[in-house]
């Protein structure tokens, strides 16, 4: 296990900027606005290959124990409590504050090894800034400007000198057998509540306030002997309602999470049905070609009549993805969790199945003989052979002639035939049609000597007339 370093401080002192500098990533959202970070975000610092360590970015502690601010503070305290070293970050431009004093008092009670990090010293007198924070009594102080990457090397030296060889941090592995699941949907449909329920702890901040989750946070889970990576994402609103830059960044991170996952769980609110924005998010999942499971949350609070209405709306608005399984759950009370994971397993197995060329050609032959392509303006498409073209989604490349006139209805027939034959559920299926090149196209047959002589006689005869 690697040593764990926690970044702690009040809002907007630059913790996320330091996190990005140490991890050489842009994983943490950064904006000149307090309260951007809320959930714990873990990364690995490998700037010194001899001594890598885990860094955890935390939300700013604002001194309020209620609502989102209180939940954010609890997340920060949890991170500091499990850390081997705490980096207490303060703002060198604004100077010390009463909130810094409160955080320092709490850190002293925690009794974890702590380094004072004075950020944003660019444009200031460093000695003056250091003297202002001297009353905190730290022997280990690092002054830096994370935005300009000044002082990061000094910070690494200080951290390296204080870290144990073994620590309490667990590294997110790159095990290809680990199923990557992204929970996506509109704001306030219960994504964070569901992830917390699966983890058995308040790992994500869950609130009735829409837009609570700002970043895409990945955590590992072992359940029934299988390994998963759960990705909690920010809710996606309609583009016309997205005004703040932070929300635009959050939306980008959510779309990025969809691209990187293997199974996307689209969460719907049973009390609101299927909205146009739900369909837009579904479109993003289909564009990425990801396996899909639809989770209808808050199902337990609905009457029989409301459930019947929701089922009817679901079949009408999501009929075009009838291949995706829909699971009724309650993230708050934990009902439907087993059914949800069973659907995820089936979708993942279908999306990542490796097909042999012989079995897909046999399927194409049966489909072709059972229902040949129709004649279009006297032209009939011929399907010669097919081979696998990849997974997630399953892709089949069909070769033949006159495929440009192959009607869409026949392409849907092939998709449905392959789904039924190979029992593919919960995943899109992609067909690519390629026509074989005509080797004689653009070429003329060479004439024999006899044909040349005949052509000359014919031309003399025509001219003679």
Swiss-Prot record:
Q: Say yes or no: keyword Ribonucleoprotein present.
A: no
Q: Where is GTP 2 bound in this sequence?
A: 185-192, 232-236, 297-300
SUPFAM superfamilies reported in the protein's UniProt record: P-loop containing nucleoside triphosphate hydrolases (SSF52540)
Keyword Isomerase among record annotations = no
The record, for InterPro entries, names: AAA+_ATPase, G_ENGA, GTP-bd, GTPase_Der, KH_dom-like, KH_dom-like_a/b, P-loop_NTPase, Small_GTP-bd
Origin: domain of life? Bacteria
Annotated binding of GTP 1, by residue: 9-16, 57-61, 119-122
Q: What is this protein called?
A: GTPase Der
Subunit structure and binding partners: Associates with the 50S ribosomal subunit.
* PROSITE patterns per UniProt: G_ENGA (PS51712)
